[in-house]
Amino acid sequence: MEHPLKTLWEKQSRLVIGFMSGTSADGVDAALVRITGFGTQTRAEQLGFRFVPFSDEVRAEILRLAGGGPASAADFCRMNFLLGELFCEAGEALCAQTGTKLSDID
């Protein structure tokens, strides 16, 4: 069985979603991008964009954890999983907005 990353690497065109949450901690940016080519011939075309704001509570907790004050490993683990869920929701919203099936994302 061929490794899934090798299969992805060999595709001429890949459909991906990039996620980011910056230092303002105001929400998640998600971009749907088609990547074609390889090496110096690589090209990226943005097909869609979505911003999903964090709730005031989530933003406050992110800033508290980033502030260097007292926090437990459990606090960071909870935030890690919550951010994963919020990034996933942003990706799902972006796919719905652009009419892209989740199964089409590489």
Which role fits each region the language model picked out?
Residues 1-106:
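Short acidic/glycine-rich loops and adjacent helix/strand connectors
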